[in-house]
């Protein structure tokens, strides 16, 4: 996530968080932390903003983690994901990294979150300066997540200073985001655009991007068109993790939007998932046999040669 937030914003957020924390018992170190925005504040099931005001419509509480949280927890043997889950966290957005530059703790974070029973999504920070690179970024992401049960969205973090420094126009940036999200969606995953208020209003044409929004705005304001996740602070405290943690609230039930098992359709293509993982190769469902390509798409209404033998598939994908 973008680290160079303005000094003014950080100062205001810090003040707000101090006010909120004045009304709770200070955390007693690593194992008993209570974050400033609702993980235990005000009692079980309470969701509050930086000023302690209730936040309505929250479906799930989550966190964002990367190598930074992993390293901050190293003295305690790494992130204690079981403790994280017990604190009320139900999903984690895991940092994948940059193009051809995987976060060094991506695998550990994914495995730890999944082993504890958390839902997982990923976020990827773009450095693309053209649509071809944005497309390549999407392909890189897909190559890294194909073997994991992704039950939350795949996020494109567009807050890139490199993009602005190179003078890309709003339309050029929008085109890049569109290409990335289309590629992710075509592969059967649910894309989401991560950005703050300035980027959404000044650097992207949101009328061309009909995707979920992961809204990064610290403090109290959490509403934006298509906002499904709100990132409300990067100074939360969560049991099981050392140091600051970025806290998220989800306002939709992704369990109903992203199927865990069975067939799912993306435009004209069909995929089959088991525990959120896209299946490939031969598949038997009931008394019918199907074949799913390397990209997970069901082969249908054609004849293909597989291992030297021709196979014909009906319009519904069933083997003749």
Language model features with spans:
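Aromatic-lined carbohydrate-recognition surfaces of secreted/lumenal glycan-active proteins
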Residues: 184-202
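Substrate-binding cleft of extracellular glycoside hydrolase catalytic domains
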Residues: 35-181, 185-187
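Structural recognition of alpha->loop->beta junctions
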Residues: 142-156, 160-162, 204-226
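Glycine-rich, charge-decorated loop segments at or immediately adjacent to ligand/cofactor-binding or catalytic sites
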Residues: 133-136, 199-207
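Extracellular adhesion/carbohydrate-binding repeat motifs centered on closely spaced tryptophans
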Residues: 22, 30-31, 258-320
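Functionally critical loop-and-helix segments that line ligand-binding/catalytic clefts
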Residues: 32-82, 208-260
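Hydrophobic anchor at the start of a short beta-strand
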Residues: 120, 190-192, 213
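Sec-dependent N-terminal signal peptides of Gram-positive bacterial secreted proteins and lipoproteins
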Residues: 4-30
């Amino acid at each position: 996530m973008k680290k160079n937030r303005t000094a003014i914003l950080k100062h205001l957020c810090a003040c707000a968080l101090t006010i909120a924390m004045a009304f709770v018992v200070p955390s007693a170190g690593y194992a008993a932390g209570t974050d400033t925005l609702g993980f235990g504040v005000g009692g079980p099931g309470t969701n509050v903003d930086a000023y302690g005001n209730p936040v309505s419509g929250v479906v799930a509480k989550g966190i964002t983690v990367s190598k930074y949280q992993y390293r901050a927890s190293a003295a305690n043997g790494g992130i204690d994901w079981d403790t994280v889950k017990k604190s009320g966290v139900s999903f984690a957005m895991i940092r994948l990294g940059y193009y051809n530059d995987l976060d060094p703790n991506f695998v550990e974070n994914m495995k730890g979150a999944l082993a504890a029973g958390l839902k997982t999504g990923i976020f990827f920070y773009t450095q693309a300066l053209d649509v071809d690179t944005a497309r390549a970024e999407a392909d890189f992401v897909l190559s890294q997540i194909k073997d994991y049960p992704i039950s939350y969205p795949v996020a494109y973090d567009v807050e890139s200073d490199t993009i602005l420094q190179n003078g890309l126009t709003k339309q050029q940036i929008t085109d890049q985001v569109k290409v990335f999200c289309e590629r992710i969606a075509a592969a059967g995953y649910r894309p989401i655009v991560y950005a703050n208020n300035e980027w959404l209003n000044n650097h992207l044409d949101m009328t061309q991007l009909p995707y979920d929004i992961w809204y990064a705005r610290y403090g109290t304001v959490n509403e934006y068109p298509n906002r499904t996740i709100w990132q409300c602070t990067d100074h939360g405290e969560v049991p099981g993790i050392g140091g600051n943690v970025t806290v998220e609230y989800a306002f939709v039930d992704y369990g109903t939007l992203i199927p865990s098992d069975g067939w799912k359709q993306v435009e004209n293509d069909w995929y089959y998932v088991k525990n959120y993982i896209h299946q490939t190769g031969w598949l038997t469902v009931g008394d019918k046999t199907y074949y799913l390509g390397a990209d997970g798409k069901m082969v249908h209404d054609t004849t293909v040669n597989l291992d030297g033998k021709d196979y014909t598939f009906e319009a519904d994908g069933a083997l003749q």
